[in-house]
Curated annotation (Swiss-Prot):
Compartment(s) where it occurs, according to its Swiss-Prot or TrEMBL record: Plastid, Chloroplast
Subunit structure: Part of the Tic complex.
Species for this entry: Piper cenocladum
Record-stated family: Belongs to the TIC214 family.
Transmembrane spans: none
Annotated protein name in UniProt: Putative protein TIC 214 C-terminal part
Annotated PANTHER family: PROTEIN TIC 214, PROTEIN TIC 214-RELATED
Gene that this polypeptide is encoded by: TIC214
Functional description taken from the UniProt entry: Involved in protein precursor import into chloroplasts. May be part of an intermediate translocation complex acting as a protein-conducting channel at the inner envelope.
Amino acid sequence: MKPEEIRVNGKEIFKDEEEEDKDLFWFEKPLVTLLFDYKRWNRPLRYIKNDRFENAVSNKMSQYFFHTCPSDGKKIISFTYPPSLSTIEEIIQKRMSLYTTEKGSPEDLYNNWVYTNKKKKNNLSNELINRIEAIEKGSVSIDVLEKRIRLCHDENEQKCLPKWYDPFFNGPYRGTITKVDSQNEDEHFGEMTWKKKIYDIPHKLKNSQEFEEKRNTFHFNRKLLSTDSNNLFTPIGEFDEELASSFYLKEIFLDSEKKSLYSENQKKNGKQPVDTIKNNSNDQALRKHEIEIEKMNKKLPRWSYKLIDDLEQQEEENPEESTGNPGIRSRKAKRVVIYTDKDQNIHTDTSTDSDQAEEIALIRYSQQSDFRRDLIKGSMRSQRRKTLILEMFQANAHPPLFLDRLNKTSFSFNFSKMSMGKELEFKTANSENAEKREAVIKEKTDKSDRLAIAETWDSVTFAQPIRGCILVAQSIVRKYIILPTLIIGKNLGRILFWQSPEWDEDFHEWKKEMHIKCTYNGVQLSETEFPKAWLTDGIQIKILFPFSLKPWHRSKQTSLQVDPIKVKKQNFCFLTVWGRETEQPFGPPRKNPPFFKPILKELKKEMINRFFRVPKTLKNGTKGFMKVEKEKTTLIIQIVFFLKRKMKEFLFVFVKVNPTPLVRSQKIYESNENEKNSILSNKITYESNIQKKSTIDLKNLSLTEKKIKDLSDHTSIIRNQIERVAKDKKRIYLISDRNPSTGETGWYDKDKGRESKKGIWQIFKKRSTRLIRKWPYFLKSLIQKIYTETLLFTISSTDDYAKFFIESTKKSLNKHIYNDEKDKRVIDEINQNTIEFISTINRSFSNITNIFNNSNKNSLTYFELFSLSQAYVFLKLSQTQVFNLYCLGSLLQYHGASTLFKKKIKDYLGSQGIFNFKLKQKKLQNSGINDWKNWLRSHYQYNLPKIRWSRIVPQKWRNRINERRTIKKKGSIFSHSYAKENDQFIYYKKQKNFRMNSLTNQKEKLKKHYRYDLSSYKYLHYEELKNSPLISRSPFQIKGGQEIPYNYNNYNRPKYESFFYVPEIIAINDYLIMGEYVFNTDKNRDRKYLDWGILNLGFKKNINIEYWTHMDTRPFSQDTRTRSNDYRVVENKNLFFLRIHQEINPSNQKNTLFDWMGMNEEMLYYSISSIEPWFFPEFVPRYDIYKIKPCIIPIKSLFLNFYGKESISKNINVNRKANHDTSSNFKKYPVFKNINQEEKEGQGQEVLRSNAQNQQKSFIEKDYKESDIQKPRTKAQSKNNKETELDSFLKKYLLFQLRWNNSLNQKVIDNIKVYSLLLRLKNPREIAISSIQRGEMRLDVMLFQKDITLSGLIKGGLLVIEPIRLYLKWDFQFFMYQIVGISLVHKDKQQIKTRCRIKEYVDKMDFDGSFLPYGKTLVKGHEKHYDLLVPEHILSPRRRRELRILMSFNSGKENIMGRGPFILNGKSVRNCEPFFYEDKYLDTDANKFIQFKFFLWPNYRLEELACMNRYWFDSNNGSRFSMLRIRMYPRHRIL
């Protein structure tokens, strides 16, 4: 291999020499080299590195070094002088010290410098004059123009290199572009093989030992060798030995049997593969010759160090080939190995290293903001402006001006409809209640706290080793000391309290606890395996099934009743430095289940039971007392029955002695028989029958037998009566409620009262017992009833309060609206502020509507009046014809006054500065004198379209406004009544109040302040820029008779076509129709990359935008049949196709110069950005494409559009006869070869484009193939399709970072943590099931979709690419379009009423015949004033720039704007200064606009990069160029 060349301080050294320097000892090196490294980088602050190069390019253009240097003819001190140039100058002065040199005076130096510049300027001016004179003499214009050379790589000169690879355009390219003919590829390869092998012979001979041995034995005559005609040893004649024929030439002719070295023709002709090779012992000539043969390259100064960052060093496959310590500071990250595959049986590839195990690692990035930005270690950091960081850990710094991209509203209010006209339902965007929101907020705060603690441990020196050792010690102490001690103490305590110990249960749970070693991020490894470099990277210890000491173990039945959520939370934890447990790493310590709490709880219950034992005894005593009383009651009853029986016996004896009273009593008893119950009557009758029977038997029996029989009969009767009374006791009590009458009392009345008292006591006793038994249930139901009633009352009262609040709010709103309606009748003419001014204009509109329409059917739609600027009011005034206010619309469309307005309204509008006219005034006042008005009109921030103000209001109201935006004719079905409008306004006022009362957004405030500061700064310098074409127009004036088709989107047009329709007077950012391709140029706009007029929308097909801006600008009464063909011709064209402009007749077409803002480029890539959706999310991909690949504007000849009409596509009908002469003239010049071929081949340009794209791809592939950065791989690896696809995505960025979606990222990381543990376990079943139950391992993430692609992941939002885009270096075309961009948009394309139309400015062959004073000829044709012939364009851009620079040296001494008239072709034309003050409506008058543009081109050019001294800013990224005041060069004078 040839040694690598490295250029250091102007010297060329090789890698071999560098290695020799490294072999030197430290004492052998000079003292200066030890103290100061002369190869070390100074500045730039960036390490310019690319994958295509091994070492980075040394950029020494921006460094502080003070030295004197000549500038503008004088010697000044430069603080950025190149140090190498200073060193060379000192060396030259030392060599020339022997000679005496005379130093000239400073005046002579300055005079020489001025003389040289004048001479150069005169030469350029004379050359320009000569070219112009040649044109006047009738020379061919294409020969007069100065041409630029393009490098072509095709014989037909049809295919040129792209601009970036063309050395004539972009300078020498660092890469190589080679193209080998396929026919001669084999011969070329064989020849190169020959040459390489022969080149290697001297190098091999030099270091060969065999050569040294044979050198002493073999000698032969050199002359004989030199006379041999077939001598092949001429290249090694220096060594005059014979060894080449016997030793090294064998290696050359190894494959001579398969293929001859050269053909027979070559042998006959005596040709040799190599003609001559000069002898050089240092191989320098051989190497140079080899470089000339293989390729052409340019040696660039490179750093001798091959710097790498930390991640590159960690990802090196071969640590032995490491280049040393990393020298570039990358984002703080660590490589964490999560799995090491040590199973060697799996590998079947013999090329793999069996000793090296395969590792799977993750990159752990720090959560801090990355402000290192690839800085070189030891270099100075750049001083930049302060950046605001809103979040605690923010990846990239965002300027506050662009914070609208990051707006994320977490909470919003919405009003819903009133139910029954009284109730309002408040709905929030998130349906979570207050508790859930608090939980989410707490979770976020905990996460931020954990991140802060983790970063603190990372930032402190030697913190990770200390923490790791403490964690390991805490794990050992906990597992083997603390927990066993607690178990022993617990069981001894149980033994002392006469309880059974629980040794087995406790030690079983202790053995179940596992201490898993984890990485710093929490990735689980195993119990015994420590993470790699855990002392420096950090470690976590995760405890699975943590042991918690319990006072006793419950049975299995009671353990099943435990809440599963609590068990789930206790399954794992992390160990802290203090030996405590936490849920998450670096989280707060959690509370362990207390040991003594259950014991104290049981003791409390026991104490409560002892304290309440007395009430229990009383309760038991009461029960015993009641039982005794019951027994006593039954005894008394028995005694009473016994006494009754004795009394009956006594009565029986008494009746037997005195029978008469018995009969009397019987009669009395029988007399009352009808009044007794049936039971008593039966009983008495039964007794009487027995007595009768007994009196009969007394006669036959003796007295003793009679007595015995009577007693037994009486006993049986009493027994039966007792039983009957016991059964029918309740019934007897109910019947005996009747009070006996006087004289009817008997013996049974007393018994009846006694029985009733006894029943009442029994009832009371039973009910009291029932009450005691059911008292707890009764108390519980009572409490529930009270609680329910209280809750219902509270809810109803809250509802009443809400109704009262809503009613009061409604009344206040109605009162406020009533006051507004009342205030509309009065106009305050003395004190008017901005809000009153806007409301007064609104009232004036409604008054005008009432005057001319006499109805409220077409009343104005109310909108947010307090958030609109004056510029918006101006715009609405100019568009009032949409609301059928024709009188006001006509006033604004042409110069003149209206007699239909009242004097009061006119005077008021004039007093506010909008219109200053009187009743008899015929012309509007020139608005150019009001600087602030022009300033507002010239900036898009204050030129609000309808889309901007509609964003202020909520979505529902905006939808209604958009639907009702188009107002139909009077009496249309779409018109709405005034009452409905009033209701909508009330509804919106309520929404507005709630929106204003919500929390203000911090980002919005910051963005507003920054925008105000920027606008104020620009307005302060407005006087210096007031002559700029940005403010040279008024958006109020429209030619009379021209309609503004404001509702043009309602016509049947394609969406992409309706977007590009621009009315005559409204700017393109004023007229954004809500369609498919609508975007907002104010809200989301990046001023570093994006200009308001240059937007690459990324269409999938070519769309001629400028062409559509001219369509349908004629009145709608014209023939519209040709509109369907307006866009057919555009789809088949490529980036470089010539522009087509549709006329009334499609065959009449002509080409113009400008590719309007470069938007006809085909979209090559789809959107892959993660920027949040804008107001119109359809245009996010277009914005991304612009930033990925900015506008490419092709360079064309400036006079290409002057050569007539061309036929671009076969779809257009062209009149061949009329253009026969023109097409024949085209063939004479090589510029138009492609145009003629395009007529023959319809798809030719498509082939060109595909070839250009393939060439660029081949260039990139070639560069990557030739890169030396690819290292040899030790394993047989190959990229799969996904890696290739990912590489193709990332090639478009220089810096980028990939990340998953947040939700998916957390799931994947959790699964990876579990996988890494399961792979190390022998029996992972239990851990896997536990992980699934805890939710750590998700089964849905484990499912892998086979057909998924990278683009699908990106579109689905799972994979996000966050590019860090660099600045763009604008070329000449960019500045040119900046100047003409607004004139292209605002050009007046009104209908010319006359039959005379404007033709092309320049004829085909004759300039003088067609160039009139204003550069146009009146012929039939449409008006197309895009470009004029400027004499300066004859020169090339480089010579043109040189001429302007030379002319600007003395421009400060002359009054440029006050010069005399400009002479061209004997015609006098006024200077351009009067145009700024005479009339501001240049784009409404074609003649004036052409004059103005004619002077705009040569007079005002933006200062280009060649004119700027880049040392002023000491920066490479152009961030400070925004503070530069652009200098405008004056025009040159042609005498």
